[in-house]
């Protein structure tokens, strides 16, 4: 999972222009880096130009995903990431960056601003912080821990059962479970197996 670009743009009436951007092109060869960076800027501007105000969308290009968020006030953000990077985290990042940008940079400067004139330096730190979505986003961290717990729980259940033994057999032989609990287990098992067949 990797983030390559984080950009803040202004969607004017006739033209979209870049206000500020940060790039991580370290995974590309040295001679390709400037071309890749130019292409990311071009792609970001094109996607914002073709997106409606008040919209969020993701555009796939080969193994990359471009996530765009254009606010109603014409401020827009674009994240370019690989396919594996979670889109929810990208949109959370865009929302956070655009909100912070709008409070730190005067709205009057947006239509005429450029990367050289806009005083906002947080993009590089956001780009590096969000390289690992699990560390940057609490929901991703919780989801990953939940997935790990499910795997451990599944492995534990498998190891508790002896070779050739099935949970169904154990339930039917159990003296601890009441008839109502056994009936509930069998009914649940039948309903789940019905869904598996379809």
UniProtKB/Swiss-Prot annotation:
Lineage of the organism: Eukaryota, Metazoa, Chordata, Craniata, Vertebrata
Gene Ontology annotations for the cellular component aspect, listed alphabetically: cytoplasmic vesicle membrane; cytosol; endoplasmic reticulum; Golgi apparatus; Golgi membrane; plasma membrane
EC number: 2.3.1.-
Keyword Ribonucleoprotein: no
Protein name: Synaptobrevin homolog YKT6-B
Record's keyword annotation contains Metal-binding: no
Chain residues in the propeptide: 196-198
Key words of the record: Coiled coil, Cytoplasm, Cytoplasmic vesicle, ER-Golgi transport, Golgi apparatus, Lipoprotein, Membrane, Methylation, Palmitate, Prenylation, Protein transport, Transferase, Transport
